[in-house]
Curated annotation (Swiss-Prot):
Enzyme class of the recorded protein, top EC level: transferase
Binding positions for Mg(2+) per the UniProt entry: N237, D246
Native source species: Chromobacterium violaceum (strain ATCC 12472 / DSM 30191 / JCM 1249 / CCUG 213 / NBRC 12614 / NCIMB 9131 / NCTC 9757 / MK)
Molecular function via GO: AMPylase activity; ATP binding; magnesium ion binding
Protein name: Protein nucleotidyltransferase YdiU
Binding site for ATP: G74, G76, R77, K97, D109, G110, R160, R167, D246
Length: 478
């Protein structure tokens, strides 16, 4: 679909060096880099060298950014280098981020700094280990030149691997321009790539909307349980594959509070932690609008009721997905009508007392074995926790599993190690300011097994001191 992209050549960095290589992901992709010189890898994954036969492109898309429509966005500092078929037979995009200007760069330089690229690496690997669908970083390469933001910073290029880079904004780009034929081609391509079970079916475009809604409901439910805040849920950052994409101002929550916002540009709290399900539904409505002329070509308005039903049904889809995981994290057997209230009361309890989201869920598993000391220590007084615990214990009667088995199952759902904001900043600062990758590698070691408590990793489980956490802000890094 040449209308959907523009050819582009990455800018040649003066002195590329490989900062990080994801050997596990490379093996998953079937890339045999064992005998490849690091310098050669650095040139390849910085854009200095182009693989034989590759034709890099920058993709076009539109998007609602903080609710306002931008009809022409596109890859301003990224390009699609090519595709590979991984060892599971799945097609994966290989893209460079920070490789220079493209036809969509507008006034930007198309470059990226080491810090934001390592943030994407760290958080993407954490999400993968947590079982949350995500894009991943194959490599981070320094460029040997500074990029200029508030001050000069060391430049870097990230190699991103994604199921695809098809977004709600991709559809919006052509819908805005009334290019229905292109929308039709794009929809068929999306179906072939991500939802092949729908190919050739009557009503496939409405079914595509429903399938995307299902994947997004599952994804956002996982975000919410992990305490993850994306920070910039614009429609151009909703991937139709159901993967998490674009880790600009993202962060993980410490104290549980629905209004938590970290992004420095989210002044109104549009993308706050507690708003994420509703924003996903809003984005889905924008996707539905682009599909109306495909669902009912003769009269797009006639498609509105069916599309609206799917969009309005997103809330129930999400709630079901969220409650499924909540039951597992609470160690519950079977389903009861009051399970939602039990889970909601737990979250309200955490919010009321400013309790750490991750540790509260994790230490609740101790309580299943009658060892509630660590959980109780998170609260200002035991009395704050006692009434809810009585309800929770009552819900576990009768039970068919032994307490240690219940606790073990709960720990498989509730991680101990997440990318704590102060640890991420510590790692980024060491790499950016001193060229020291040690803190990044140690953090990744902890995050690669988030559910397994291990000796020597206590500091990776603990939230930041109050003075470090207060006022913490993240930035897009553009």
């Amino acid at each position: 679909m040449p209308e959907a992209w523009a050819p582009v050549r990455p800018e040649t960095p003066p002195a590329p060096e490989l900062l990080y290589w994801n050997a596990e992901l490379a093996d998953e992709l079937g890339l045999d880099a064992g005998q490849t010189d690091k310098g050669e890898l650095a040139r390849l994954f910085s854009g200095a060298d182009i693989p034989e036969g590759a034709q890099p492109i920058a993709q076009a898309y539109a998007g609602h950014q903080f609710g306002g429509l931008s009809p022409s966005l596109g890859d301003g500092r990224a390009l699609l280098l090519g595709e590979v078929t991984d060892r599971n037979g799945q097609r994966r995009d290989i893209a460079l981020k920070g490789s220079g200007q493209t036809p969509f760069s507008r006034r930007g330089d198309g470059k990226a700094a080491v810090g934001p690229m390592l943030r994407e690496l760290i958080v993407g690997e954490a999400m993968q280990a947590l079982g949350i669908p995500t894009t991943r970083a194959l490599a981070v390469t320094t460029t040997g030149e500074p990029v200029y933001r508030e001050r000069p910073l060391p430049g870097a290029v990230l190699t991103r691997v994604a199921a695809s880079h098809l977004r709600v904004g991709t559809f919006q780009y052509f819908a805005i321009r009334g290019e229905t034929a292109m929308l039709n081609k794009l929809a068929d391509y999306t179906i072939a790539r991500h939802y092949p079970q729908l190919a050739g079916r009557d009503g496939r475009h409405l079914a595509l909307l429903a399938a995307v809604a299902e994947r997004q409901a599952a994804l956002i439910a996982r975000w919410m349980h992990a305490g993850f805040i994306h920070g910039v849920m614009n429609t151009d950052n909703m991937a139709l594959s159901g993967e998490t994409i674009d880790y600009g101002p993202c962060a993980f929550m410490d104290a549980h509070y629905p209004g938590t916002v970290f992004s420095s540009i989210d002044h109104q709290g549009r993308y706050a932690y507690g708003n994420q399900p509703a924003i996903a539904q809003w984005n889905l409505a924008r996707f539905a609008e682009t599909l109306l002329p495909l669902i009912s070509p003769d009269d797009p308005a006639a498609a509105v009721p069916a599309a609206t039903e799917i969009v309005e049904g997103f809330e129930d889809l999400y709630q079901r997905r969220w409650l499924e995981q909540a039951r597992r994290k609470l160690g519950l057997e079977g389903e009861r009508d009051d399970d939602q209230a039990l889970a909601d009361d737990w979250l309200m309890l955490l919010a009321a007392h400013g309790v750490d989201h991750t540790l509260a869920w994790r230490y609740l598993a101790d309580e299943a074995e009658g060892k509630g000391e660590r959980l109780a220590a998170l609260f200002p007084s035991p009395d704050a926790l006692t009434p809810w615990l009585k309800q929770w214990h009552a819900r576990h009667v009768p039970r068919t599993r032994r307490p240690p088995d219940i606790a073990a199952a709960m720990r498989r759902e509730s991680p101990l190690y997440i990318p704590r904001n102060h640890l991420v900043e510590e790692a980024l600062d060491a790499a950016s300011e001193r060229g020291d990758m040690g803190p990044t590698l140690k953090l990744l070691e902890a995050l690669h097994q988030p559910f397994a408590e291990r000796d020597g990793l206590d500091r990776y489980a603990q939230p930041a001191a109050a003075e470090l956490a207060e006022g913490y802000r993240t930035f897009c890094g553009t």
